[in-house]
UniProtKB/Swiss-Prot annotation:
This is L-amino-acid oxidase. Keywords: Antibiotic, Antimicrobial, Apoptosis, Cytolysis, Disulfide bond, FAD, Flavoprotein, Glycoprotein, Hemolysis, Hemostasis impairing toxin, Oxidoreductase, Platelet aggregation inhibiting toxin, Secreted, Toxin. Belongs to the flavin monoamine oxidase family. FIG1 subfamily. GO terms for molecular function: L-glutamate oxidase activity; L-phenylalaine oxidase activity; toxin activity. Expressed by the venom gland.
Amino acid sequence: ADDKNPLEECFREDDYEEFLEIAKNGLKKTSNPKHIVYPVKPSEQLYEESLRDQLPTSMHRYPSMIQKIFFAGEYTANAHGWIDSTIK
């Protein structure tokens, strides 16, 4: 049986510190703001749910994509291709 705690596994992700920094401080102001897509793996659903109320409304979650912070219009190598830049 797999006894790994999904919440603990979330903290081992390579991009965790980068995401946490953006979640706490927001993005730097620019003249051309972008939406953020925060994809999560199914094993991270518990952690994602714990952050839901703390995330800015411009952050979106896609459960089937590779863990990474994507910006609107950025190309991804997964089946979804380009991230929709019209996400509101």
